[in-house]
């Protein structure tokens, strides 16, 4: 048990087919002269390498279940999912087809697929060596609005980058995490795109760890034609242990949600 200001975080490790962390987060909220102790569950699951369609279907099930339980006043669990995907491109609701630079036959040749999905944002790439994180959260549990939530995701990644000695930050009017964002050398290391309904979220962030960046050359990443992409591996000059990045990201997300 760890005491963090007015927050108590209980941590336990469960060994299953998937690696799962279970956090019970207790928050003290002052109402008048009384204090109410609210307890909520936050489960962190590692799906490892999983095809995009399967992950999308599964997180949609969890998202729908959380929305239903919230509306019915029933118990529910907040989730943070970690995974990697085989080569895939996803186009968000506001995305433009012209930002996909390959046709169907060319996509098959490079072993990739394209999905039109229900998150915000334009087109992005997911593939081996990229850490994808899908938080499925009731934002009201954490006193967050949608803009604050996106800012929190960015902040978690900025802190992870800093832990590796990389200075990262934000770029005005461009969601995600960037290096040298206000210079001609601006390059994106993490894309963010979310969906929210009834203050429940799905989709999330994609952090380039040991990603094959050549796959970004087949798109205009997030709709940009004048900015680059990078990875932890490219910036550091060596491969980065994925498990280490997962642990650091989980730590930062839990600390910020707390």
Predicted region positions:
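Short hydrophobic targeting helices and cationic amphipathic motifs
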Residues: 3, 7, 14, 22-24
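N-terminal lobe of the biotin/lipoate ligase/transferase fold
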Residues: 39-186, 239-240
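Short conserved catalytic/interaction loops centered on acidic-Pro-aromatic/His motifs
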Residues: 166-171, 202-203, 215-219
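C-terminal accessory segment of soluble enzyme catalytic cores
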Residues: 178, 195, 213-258
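Histidine/acidic-rich helix-loop-helix segments that form or flank divalent-metal centers
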Residues: 189-192
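Conserved phosphate/anionic-ligand binding catalytic regions in large, soluble enzymes, centered on
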Residues: 200-208
